[in-house]
A protein has these predicted regions:
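Short, Lys/Arg-rich flexible segments
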Residues: 2-203
Length: 203
């Protein structure tokens, strides 16, 4: 099953369109807020945060339709990336998107029968499959679905499904929808956030 892994990597996905818009317009925002220390970063950062929230709503709806994961699990396991840096050459670099670790397989549609056999389904459209060498066990304080890495009892590794960023970028149509929502939300919010900083709102 390609959706099941023992890899414990962190994954991320970048919102390219929103980043391009924010970077291209940063000098204009800086000029408007030139008299306020850190004002441009605050305005752009706040607009990006709104864009991230809007994109996350689109992503959650699409991902939970495709994957056997709840909305709350998706939200809890998807973290925002929102960093603004200015290099020594004066150019602004924005790192913006989402990150998340692979998700324990037990969180998905995974069941253990009376004999201890593990049956799982990561995608809702997929058939449930038995994992012949997998078993449920408590390792330390954590319950998980584990698999022996050979004929002997050890070593054992926990099994995981994909991280939420993987779920997003594996579907081009979903990613396009997320990016479009983030970009449009940023463009809608940036003028309001500039006004907020100018007027000292929320400080």
């Amino acid at each position: 099953m390609s959706d099941v892994t023992t890899d414990t990597m962190m994954h991320s996905v970048t919102a390219g369109i929103a980043v391009d818009i924010a970077e291209e317009g940063f000098d204009r925002v800086s000029a408007i807020l030139s008299g306020i220390p850190g004002g441009a970063n605050r305005a752009v950062g706040s607009a990006l945060a709104r864009a991230a929230a809007a994109g996350k709503t689109v992503a959650k709806r699409a991902v939970t339709q495709e994957y056997a994961i709840s909305s709350s699990e998706f939200s809890n396991r998807t973290k925002n990336i929102n960093n603004i840096q200015r290099g020594s050459n004066g150019e602004v670099s924005i790192n913006f998107g989402y990150r998340g670790s692979v998700i324990p397989l037990r969180v998905f549609d995974t069941k253990v029968d009376r004999s201890g056999r593990v049956v799982t389904r990561v995608k809702k459209s997929g058939a449930r499959q038995a994992l012949d060498h997998a078993f449920e066990a408590k390792m330390g304080s954590h319950y998980g679905i584990n698999e022996r890495q050979g004929e002997k009892r050890f070593p054992v590794k926990e099994l995981f499904g994909p991280a939420t960023p993987q779920m997003m970028y594996s579907n081009e149509n979903v990613m396009d929808s997320i990016e479009a929502k983030m970009a449009s939300t940023y463009e809608e919010r940036i003028e309001h956030e500039i006004t907020r900083v100018l007027n000292g709102w929320g400080v």
